Structure formats: C-alpha cells, structure tokens
C-alpha cells in the first residue's frame, strides 16, 4: 500500500520555542500563496526528525533550497484566501501547525476533482477557486504541533483561515522535499 498522507502529532519536542522563534522572524516573503512567509528554516535536526517518521521513504534527497520555502514559517489570517492545488514539483509537501488553541476546522482539506475523479495532478489546470468542482474527501484538523505530510501531487487546500494578526492567525511551517523512494 502506498502512503499518500500521514499525521504526526507532537512533532517538535518544544513547540513553544519553535513558535516564539517563528514569531521573531520577519514575515516579508510574498508570493503565490496566501499571507506571508519568513526565510527558509530547515535544520539538520528537522530533516532527521522527518526522516525518522518516514523510514520506508529513505533519506530526504532534495529540499528545493532555491525556492526558499522549505521550513519557512507562514502566517495567514481570516482575510486571506486560498485555492485547491497540488505541489507537483516535489514528492512530498507538509505543514506543521503552530497556533495554540486554533480552530480544528483551520486544517487542511484533501480533494478529488468531480469530473475526472483525480486525486493527484501534475498540473493545476482545473479551477481551484471553484470549490463546486471538487469533492472534499478528507479533513485533517489543525492541532498545535501537528505535522501533516502528503504527496506533493495530492490536491489540497488550507481550510478556514482565522485570526487577524501574527499572534492569533494561522501560523504554520511549510515543507517541500523529495525522498529516495515514495
């Protein structure tokens, strides 16, 4: 059986210190994503921890350092909007939720295109803003210090952004990487 997504609760040993570190960083990176991001922050310890939870996939072989997004912290608030998409340029994508007491509904949704029945895509030609064209087949709730890893080509979207500032908005850390095996 092939793994398409996995949930790791209590990922960081000290999530409060990770959150405090994230909040001290400048959120000055804008791009094709809601909200704003920091510079990448992907240490050898983080890499080893992810590899520990994915022994069947082998070592992490590429973290797309040139993109500056692997390990970046991101903030999005209730005013931000997202769309259904995939991240097909990498084998794996992930988010670690870093807002304590966040609404459970502010997690990640996994989608299937209604017309084609596709869960995975190496393109984003479908209208990701038109949620009526998609079936939501799984919801992964937002829980403090939960790491969610899923295949990069799996259609997904953030759900229910919340808050209005850095302290109470949806703070998370992004990951994009390849491994020796899928």
What residue spans do the PLM features occupy?
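Catalytic core of non-heme Fe(II) oxygenases with the double-stranded beta-helix
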Residues: 76-182
